């Protein structure tokens, strides 16, 4: 590796990196105070008022595990007793149905609703394992539609009237028109990234676009973390990533080979009888997302003491 990962945020907002000449373009981001220091403490006021939380899950860069995160967070929240709908907004390239094992049940899509060919309840696919979890695909595979921001807003407004507690939008990769339309109806966002400098750069760009679209309640999910590489200074720690982006941390998901098995079987990791380390991390992140206090997992002794803070893992 050509760079060191020992970085500190200086008082003037710049990033100091020891033993390196690597110049980072990132500046710590300042979000609304209520979304940073109170991420785990404040009650879910939206649900108390009867307003569903509309959250877009995005990344900028493809291949970082955004759709996997959407499926597992949505399933975990549903298992906690909330009504959840997952919206696959990746037009023509949907994958969320595969990760949930619902690909054979997609008959109608959101485009059929908007074109007047079916009702909303006909396009919604209810998961048979947890009936308070539903899926709505924007379009069928191989179809390419120009979904405008107005039509996307109309669609989400219709879902908000169905009694759901959480609406999670799986955003397309990239920052083109599809991204803008997908984030338009959202009030909150989860940025999924990996501890790689290219992924972090894209996440920083996405964070700026979210701000420009009026989304200030943003949380960070760091995926594919490898503790052995962090200990050898071959990978940035979660704290490095979080401080570079300046976004409140929702969770950190370790690298897990079971993700491939989970995807092929259409069964989210959080449904395994014996949860893997990444499954535990997804469940903990979901609990923090809904406002329940929880701890970051211990990657060294995960099953002996799951709920202790692993400060070395976070880089403290």
From Swiss-Prot:
CDD domains in the record: MinD
GO cellular component labels: chloroplast; cytoplasmic side of plasma membrane; cytosol
Keyword Acyltransferase: no
Keywords noted in UniProt: ATP-binding, Cell cycle, Cell division, Chloroplast, Nucleotide-binding, Plastid, Septation
Gene3D superfamilies xrefs: P-loop containing nucleotide triphosphate hydrolases
GO BP: cell division; negative regulation of cell division
Molecular function as annotated in GO: ATP binding; ATP hydrolysis activity
Record-linked InterPro entries: MinD, MinD_FleN, P-loop_NTPase, ParA/MinD_ATPase, YlxH/NBP35
UniProt key word Protein biosynthesis: no
Binding site for ATP: 61-68
Cell compartments where the protein resides: Plastid, Chloroplast
Known function: ATPase required for the correct placement of the division site.
Protein family: Belongs to the ParA family. MinD subfamily.
Descriptive protein name: Putative septum site-determining protein MinD
Organism, as annotated: Oltmannsiellopsis viridis
Gene that specifies this protein: minD
């Amino acid at each position: 590796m050509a760079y060191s990962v020992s970085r500190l945020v200086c008082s003037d907002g710049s990033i100091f990196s020891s033993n390196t000449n690597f110049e980072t373009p990132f500046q710590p981001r300042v979000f609304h105070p209520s979304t940073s220091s109170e991420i785990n403490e404040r009650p879910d006021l939206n649900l108390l008022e009867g307003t569903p939380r509309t959250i877009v899950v995005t990344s900028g860069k493809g291949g970082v595990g955004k759709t996997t995160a959407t499926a597992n967070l949505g399933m975990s929240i549903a298992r906690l007793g909330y009504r959840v709908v997952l919206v696959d907004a990746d037009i023509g390239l949907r994958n969320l149905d595969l990760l949930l094992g619902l690909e054979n049940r997609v008959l109608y899509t959101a485009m059929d609703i908007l074109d007047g060919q079916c009702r909303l309840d006909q396009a919604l696919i209810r998961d048979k394992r947890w009936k308070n979890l539903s899926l709505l695909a924007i379009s069928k595979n191989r179809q390419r539609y120009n979904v405008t921001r107005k039509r996307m807003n109309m669609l989400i407004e219709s879902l908000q009237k169905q009694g759901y507690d959480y609406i999670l939008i799986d955003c397309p990769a990239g920052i083109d028109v599809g991204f803008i339309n997908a984030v338009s109806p959202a009030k909150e966002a989860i940025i999924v990234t990996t501890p790689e400098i290219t992924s972090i750069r894209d996440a920083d760009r996405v964070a700026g676009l979210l701000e420009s679209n009026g989304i200030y309640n943003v949380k960070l999910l760091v995926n594919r973390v490898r503790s052995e590489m962090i200990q050898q200074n071959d990978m940035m720690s979660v704290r490095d990533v979080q401080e570079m982006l300046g976004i409140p941390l929702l969770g950190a998901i370790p690298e897990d080979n079971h993700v491939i098995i989970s995807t092929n079987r259409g069964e989210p990791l959080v449904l395994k009888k014996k949860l893997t380390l990444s499954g535990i991390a997804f469940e903990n992140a979901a609990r923090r997302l809904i406002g329940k206090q929880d701890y970051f997992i211990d990657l060294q002794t995960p099953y002996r003491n799951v709920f202790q803070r692993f400060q070395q893992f976070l880089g403290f």
